[in-house]
Amino acid sequence: VLGGTAAVLSSTMPPFRDSVGDHNDTEKITGEYLVELSAAQDDTLLIFGSSELCTTYIPTHPANFFAGKRAGFQVDLIGRGSCQSLIHAIELAASGDSLRGEKVVLITSPQSFVPEGIAPDLFMANFSAQQYLDLLNDPELSDEVKQYLSGRIAELLVAYRELPDAAEVDPAIQVLAAHEQSPSLLS
């Protein structure tokens, strides 16, 4: 009986990556595995964005516009509200070789260009320590890029810790960001 139920379910469900592509799951924003899986598919276009990716009721939304692979590819949406350019820079830098040579779409929102940048609490809601560590370990990323991103992360971590309702921040990440911003700090 269970085998029959599984067969019925599997025949009515779209393939995993096709069904997950239209959703902005936290695991795709703060993780790497699902992005790497999608990037490995020849018929998938990764779209990085912010809150505009959440308005799926609009006919021109990428998930609707390209539904059913009518343009010959599946879209995979990566982002949610407050995924500003810094979050995407970290995610793209952490992707290593998985995105090398791939076409991706990066939708930048107006809030990415405000002088004060992303608010510390919104940054922390989308920040991935794993992605940060992976980008630091990428020998192909320049020290200049690593230091710039580390400096920005260090600033945001300090500002976040000053918020009255801030959750605990991993002290190792704080020290690492400060050190990478200015490598001579701990030397």
Predicted segments — roles?
Residues 1-187:
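Extracellular glycan-modifying ectodomains
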